[in-house]
């Protein structure tokens, strides 16, 4: 691959101090959901780090509610990119006001049907 076609992916600092989120899906027979999420923000963006820390409880509450509104079908691995984008956009639009997260990654994700 020639150099001009190589896209350098931006690297991020990661906020990893969110608690593990545990909830149930919205299916008629709910499944258990357990996720651990890391939020990526621009390197050296102290404002993002500070605001995420200040709004940590709101973010955890949002994530718990978000996953409790999903179905097992919604949470399938092939939908993870969409879920990550939805989480990023909703945190940026509804929770953060002075900064932006750039990426969301699952560091753990289990969906267990009863």
Regions found by a protein language model. Give the residues of each.
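Flexible, low-complexity charged segments
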Residues: 1-114
């Amino acid at each position: 691959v020639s150099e001009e076609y190589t896209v350098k992916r931006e690297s991020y600092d990661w906020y990893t101090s969110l608690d593990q989120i545990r909830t149930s899906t919205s299916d008629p027979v709910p499944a258990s959901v357990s996720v651990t999420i890391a939020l990526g923000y621009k390197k050296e963006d102290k404002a993002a780090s500070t605001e995420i820390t200040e709004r940590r409880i709101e973010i955890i509450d949002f994530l718990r509610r978000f996953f409790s509104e999903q179905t097992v079908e919604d949470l399938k691995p092939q939908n993870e990119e969409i879920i990550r984008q939805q989480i990023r956009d909703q945190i940026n639009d509804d929770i953060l006001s002075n900064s932006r997260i750039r990426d969301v990654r699952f560091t753990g994700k289990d969906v267990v049907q009863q």
